[in-house]
């Protein structure tokens, strides 16, 4: 799974895709692939943590939480944790792996989960058990109008626009904001870029003076805790809405100021930057290159928008004081003068004829963070690298149960004794049982020596190149590897460790036979022999014989035979004398919609949502293009295409999903849901000797607005079909009285309009009055045969009977049974025409068959 997800992710690390210069349609596939990979990475991580958790001692008084540090150096930082609790706590108390009380802050309790902050310490590439207890009370007043916020290091003052007019370093008695200036979101309202709009920001744009965002400003303090205080600044510009959270911390993160932003961006011909006019001056700033750094001067005619990876820094010319800036997703900078750095956030160019669609580029909801750290003296490269790495690879939390374990309450796989030598990556070797360790030097000044200490003794060690070929011997003794590395260099080592003496917590699995009644897959030569849904089938040549997903094995049915079980309310008997405690199965919905389902086992009922076998797993939200969502289910299989009777359909993905249900003691059977759209592919019984582990922090970030993590299980009931009460004015014909045009607007998916006359086939409607129209939907006759799916048609409209029909949208080359579309541009129309030009997949066909036709506001 890990290799598959990684390859899918790096497919998109190329010129057009990564830089944002592909066409909008291409990003639908990019977003889907990225979200699939993020889900798979997270599932692999959780499964791996579960294996380690089983060997750790989690016996605590309260709720045990394992904190995981993926970085190659010890971390002290504030962990954001969300744990399940039966009721809202008045307060919380947290203890570390040594039983020492640590600072914590209760943020919120909702939907059975408590959100809190913990000032934590976790070893390099390691784990630590924390004890969370409910007790006492908390004092965190919120929603107070306030223009000032401070912690033990900084004091921040805002002006009436919500911009920072003063940022005082209280420890060093240093005002960070240039006199008469403000730290702000700076908006350039002229951002024309005609030849290469998405590619280029024009020098004339950033030479202009940007404006502050001053519309509908609201400032409030929403957090006032012992670990975090937060000001929320809300404002607007035109249709764009900005919400910025300025966060100050205590404890291990006290020296860092976070600016977390949520932006609904709807501004064309505009460029948004974060502007930092500082009370330090230097002709050169330092920019992170990922491995190493580079100094660059002020803007020139040819170098005015420059890149940096995780951080940039501006330190006064005498090295008396400086400011480092970290970020989690933005890479473009400019430096207009000696005292100002600006970070590029959003770029929507004004265009003319070339790439006209790019004038809506970046439209939608965005979430991003940048941070500021003041420092006395010269830039400490190593310290800044560590802080930037930590911002982008935060501590992750996992809730588990209480049990003993031989690893104790703290464990580290490998650590370096030299802060300048950071462990950048650890992986299994591609063709051996060795571990590959990659390190790099961060200080950039001198040759460094370091010792890497592993959790077990080293049997062999070699230096390797990037392709894992040995290039020399390495020095080691016991569990320690000796390293000599040049400034800003990278070194790779292959290490074979002595086999662990830890107990083997193997789980017991057994295949549960299913009564297959559905042929779900077809080979290229015989595509018409299977019909999973509407004439489509899985591509048999892609299917494996078995799937091993997060430690659970599944055995699939024969590829050229029945290999799916339709859920018809059947009862599956469990083996006699059953001692298994869990059933896992692979399933998908044979529909364009996700399906809700109830599985019954003994007295236990499990409610699940079974996603569609095809379509997208998720999308970013892009205004008037896509809506943001992400399906919850665990992905077990991804196919790159599907079959119909006549052809391959590339980029029409197919999926199987993994689900698990608890088997109560004494249960003898499992009752399946009664829904013939739900299909099971394999089932596995399990006795697992591992603890339950659930993620207790966000494992990855999205910009999906409102934390929407699913799609409707059926058609959206809030969408009103404007045709439902429309008058049918005329039509090309119908086959019989039971297949008249009105049957495709009656809301009944079992009735249809069928016209067997000559093409084009059409139906005209009168909505009764002019209506605003933004989208429409067709459900074709693919359930009868895939060849009956409408291949091409026009949606047309007009406002007066004597006007010519105007095309509002067009479908061409369609092969989907259900088509739901947003209009390229919203329209006003009273009269609607559906004009079918290619009623079937076969070019010779002439019969139109449409079950449902809907038009939406």
Could you tell me what each predicted segment is?
Residues 614-623, 710-745:
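Predominantly extracellular/luminal regions of secreted and cell-surface proteins
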Residues 68-71, 85, 249-251, 427-429, ...:
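Extracellular and analogous surface-interaction loops
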Residues 234-240, 348-350, 415-417, 444, ...:
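Extracellular beta-rich ligand/substrate-recognition surface
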Residues 115-120, 482-483, 492-494, 572-573, ...:
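Exposed aromatic-hydrophobic patches
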Residues 50, 54-507:
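C-terminal (or distal) subdomains of carbohydrate-active enzymes
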Residues 500-716:
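N-terminal/edge-of-domain interface segments
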Residues 572-580, 588-593, 677-714, 736-807, ...:
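Aromatic, loop-rich ligand-recognition surfaces of beta-strand-rich domains
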Residues 1-56, 60-63, 389-394, 398-401:
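Metal- or metallocofactor-binding catalytic centers and their adjacent structured scaffolds
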